[in-house]
């Protein structure tokens, strides 16, 4: 029998995945493609697409400290038989800006403190490459940018190659923008702002830089100081670099069946057809429309598989409850509670029609996100829209799957609930009675009364124009409709 493997649900440490015999969907074939690009790369993807795990893989591949462990770590993967000349050639510094948490007070101080910790860990990890005086200088310094300057100077003098990896480069800046407004955000990312100033220093300190995040907004505002970043998010060769293809999912499910970890009679094709409407259908590049191969949200697939292993069947709830946190974060980042009429209209239209025609803007500053023409692009980067087709010179952006559709309906439902609260338990009971016993009169009567009360609120969300949206938002509470 095939050896059993653990499901790496929620695991972002590549070395842990390999050493603990967890299942890994091989993405190492993208390493040569990335090396063919410019040295400073920026890649944007929605949450739960495996960004952190991918960056962890790159760190392990390029780290000179574990160069001699290459076959042990990568021997079973695509790159194991065809390593590039740059394998194991770098001292790698990894920063995860989601770790710069807390409230807005003393943000610069906390950012400096986090970078201090990372730079100290770096100099300790690569201690054999630096003399004692340099190590002591770095560890004694309180200002993180001075630590970096000391490291960079010594590395340059000794011809060391440094690789910078930044995960969630936009995490705390997006939080600042949402919670404190554009004025505080602008002070941090423009002119002599500390965040922008760091990016200027990064530019001259590293041979290679790879940054990942979920939003292009901070990218636009800080890269005028960085000004050498190469945006590869919508390039066709990287469309499937993160997430799973159908073949990836098929191979994974088949292996778990053959290893006896899911029932032997599991119908793999039926399982794939079951999850496609919920987790699949992402396309991030216009040039990939003709291929018809789309991308699954990988964390959702792992959630489904983990439940299938436990229960021998699909989970009762096809949407991972942990994504509720992601939805709340996205709501804050999109500032859904502060939407003006135009952007509310865009949300409503997408919810009712399933798509919208728009230009896709690669980057845009924070000052532009209030403009309705940029809003669909923001929804695209957050995974709330995907590329469905072309429409002349523009794109048809649509809801990718049921998981995202539920989020749109949830937003509408929250708006309606604020105007006229409906007891969702009572309504859910009525929906079940309608589905199993044909008692449709109670549901329609209940909804008609509720809609009339919503529509009477003139300054709400113009509910009189959205009968269809109202019904869809509430009927979608039940899996029967």
Task: State each model region's role.
Residues 2-32, 38:
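N-terminal pre-Walker A segment at the start of P-loop NTPase domains
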Residues 163-167, 193, 207-214:
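Structural recognition of the conserved hydrophobic beta-strand(s) that form the central parallel beta-sheet
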Residues 229, 294-481:
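Extended alpha-helical interface modules used as scaffolds for assembling large macromolecular complexes
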Residues 150-158, 184-209:
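Substrate-engagement module of ASCE P-loop NTPases
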Residues 218-225, 232-306:
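Amphipathic alpha-helical segments of the small helical/lid subdomains adjacent to P-loop NTPase cores
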Residues 51:
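Conserved lysine of the Walker
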Residues 10, 26, 60-124:
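P-loop NTPase motor core
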Residues 46-47:
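The conserved Walker
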């Amino acid at each position: 029998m095939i050896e059993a493997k653990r499901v790496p649900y929620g695991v972002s440490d590549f070395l842990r995945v390999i050493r603990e015999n967890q299942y890994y969907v091989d993405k190492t074939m993208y390493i040569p493609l990335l090396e063919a690009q410019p040295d400073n790369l920026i890649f944007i993807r929605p949450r739960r697409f495996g960004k952190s795990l991918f960056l962890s893989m790159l760190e392990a591949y390029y780290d000179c400290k574990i160069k001699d462990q290459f076959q042990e770590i990568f021997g079973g993967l695509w790159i194991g038989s065809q390593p590039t000349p740059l394998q194991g050639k770098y001292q790698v510094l990894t920063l995860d800006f989601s770790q710069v948490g807390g409230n807005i007070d003393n943000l610069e101080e906390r950012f400096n403190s986090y970078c201090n910790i990372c730079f100290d860990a770096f100099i300790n990890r690569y201690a054999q490459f630096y003399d004692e005086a340099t190590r002591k200088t770095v560890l004694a310094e309180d200002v993180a940018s001075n630590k970096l300057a000391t490291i960079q100077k010594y590395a340059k003098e000794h011809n060391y190659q440094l690789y910078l990896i930044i995960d969630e480069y936009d995490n705390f800046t997006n939080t600042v923008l949402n919670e404190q407004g554009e004025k505080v955000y602008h002070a941090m990312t423009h002119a002599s702002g500390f965040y922008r100033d760091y990016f200027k220093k990064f530019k001259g300190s590293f041979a290679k830089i790879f940054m990942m995040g979920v939003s292009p907004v901070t990218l636009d505002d800080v890269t005028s100081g960085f000004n050498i970043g190469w945006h590869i998010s919508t390039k066709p060769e990287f469309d499937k670099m993160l997430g799973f293809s159908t073949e990836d999912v098929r191979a994974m499910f088949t292996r778990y069946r053959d290893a006896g970890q899911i029932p032997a009679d599991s119908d793999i094709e039926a399982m794939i057809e079951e999850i496609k409407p919920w987790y699949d259908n992402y396309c991030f590049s216009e040039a990939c429309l003709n291929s018809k191969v789309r991308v699954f949200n990988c964390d959702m697939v792992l959630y489904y598989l983990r439940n299938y292993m436990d229960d021998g069947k699909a989970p009762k709830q096809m949407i991972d409850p942990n994504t509720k946190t992601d939805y709340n974060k996205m709501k804050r980042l999109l500032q859904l509670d502060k939407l003006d009429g135009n952007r509310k209209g865009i949300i409503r239209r997408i919810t009712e029609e399933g798509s919208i025609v728009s230009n896709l803007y690669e980057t845009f500053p924070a000052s532009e996100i209030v403009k309705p023409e940029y809003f669909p692009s923001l929804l695209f980067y957050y995974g709330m829209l995907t590329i469905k087709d072309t429409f002349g010179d523009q794109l048809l952006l649509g809801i990718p799957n049921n998981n995202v559709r539920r989020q749109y309906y949830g937003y509408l439902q929250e708006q309606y609930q604020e105007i006229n609260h409906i007891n969702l338990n009572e309504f859910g009971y009525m929906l079940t009675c309608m589905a199993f016993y044909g008692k449709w009169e109670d549901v329609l009567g209940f909804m008609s009364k509720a809609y009339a009360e919503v529509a009477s609120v003139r300054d709400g969300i113009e509910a009189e124009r959205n009968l269809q949206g109202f019904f869809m938002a509430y009927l979608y509470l039940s899996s029967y409709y």
